[in-house]
């Protein structure tokens, strides 16, 4: 999971207790985890530091994840009713998207 919000990290770890959950809070740590573990599924927030209010860092992270391990299924998690950027992420290669606030049952179904 690539998420900079510690509260949401905890919620998602709790939601996916049946899975091995790796946590990254920014692009550098996400790419390091990806190289080390090559997870089949990545949940990724589009609003990542240093551009936590925008999506440029999240989109760049998505592109790099897919370039490194193209088979990875990336599910982008967006906030603020940002469906336009979620659709853009799917066009880049994201597997699916989910809008915050997170409903854990629905997110488990997507994964």
Region annotations inferred by a language model:
Residues 32, 52-71, 88:
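Short amphipathic alpha-helix used as the core "switch/output" element in two-component signaling
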Residues 28-35, 63, 108:
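Alpha2 helix of the CheY-like receiver
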Residues 44-45, 49:
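Active-site T/S-Asp motif of two-component receiver
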Residues 80-81, 92:
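Short, conserved "switch-loop" micro-motifs in signal-transduction and mechanochemical regulators
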Residues 5-28, 36, 41:
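Two-component/phosphorelay signaling modules centered on CheY-like receiver
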